[in-house]
Amino acid sequence: MNSTCCSACKVMKCDCAPNCIFAPHFPLTNLETFERLHRIFGAGNVFKILANLDPIQRETAVNALCYEAEALERDPIFGCVGIFNHYKNQLQNLDEQINSAKNELAAIIGLDNVPQYSSIPMPADFLTNKFSLHPYIEKMEGLDEVQKKELMQLPPVDAQVIVNEMFRKRGNIKICGGHGDACASTSGGTSATQKTLPFPQNHNQP
């Protein structure tokens, strides 16, 4: 057997031809990855998928197959769908927390001053590179304060003052919650927490 064969040919115990369809994507150092693919999908099925694609499309297909195989190995029932649902639930919870925070900010600084957050655009190489969150986390951590404010489109207000005011407001609400009439003397006779705001309330809050 050729000592420089790819991991696919090593697993299948065959000679690695110069034009081997697996060689560009499964070097010998990637043996564990192909073993997983072979175990989950079968080497023959992987070959058929790659053979029916243009060479420029194969790297994306290999990345997708590897991701799906790893997901199915971790969760044989749901696979990638289970991962998708997990992160979808996390995003929904974060969305509820953001809306709750917006409500609190609107009560303190006014609805017009609530920051409007922009989404981070998907990188152009997102589908061609092996998926990992670490590079994007490192990029976020490397931003300075000006870049962070530009990304989030923050208004020209002191964020620390807002946070301090929010916690002070929360403290007052907790204190008032146990003293009934002692809290009735607010300006205008209406508590800020009683205002009707356009953001959905988070019913999971204690």
Swiss-Prot record:
Protein's recorded name: LOB domain-containing protein 35
PANTHER family: LOB DOMAIN-CONTAINING PROTEIN 32-RELATED, LOB DOMAIN-CONTAINING PROTEIN 4-RELATED
Native species: Arabidopsis thaliana
LOB domain: residues covered: 4-105
Superkingdom of this protein's organism: Eukaryota
InterPro entries: LOB
Regions that span the bilayer: none
Region listing for Disordered, in residue ranges: 184-206
Family as reported in the entry's similarity comment: Belongs to the LOB domain-containing protein family.
